[in-house]
């Protein structure tokens, strides 16, 4: 896997869940499905990754792609290199 090769990383899965049309994971991430940080009710919403977030900027600047940009599903925790 890309994770085992050091070419992918998942950050704060609870605050940055994997979301598909038929559900999301982890199951206790319900309050973080709202991705607008001003509307999110999660206690740790400051740990959510979004395009203005420092983690997003650093990873993108270093050539990583983000699962939050995927079309079919969203993997907000996932950064990876092609």
What is each residue range found by the language model?
Residues 1-6:
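Active-site-adjacent substructure of cysteine-protease-like catalytic cores
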Residues 7-9, 13-82:
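Catalytic cores and adjacent binding grooves of peptidoglycan-active enzymes
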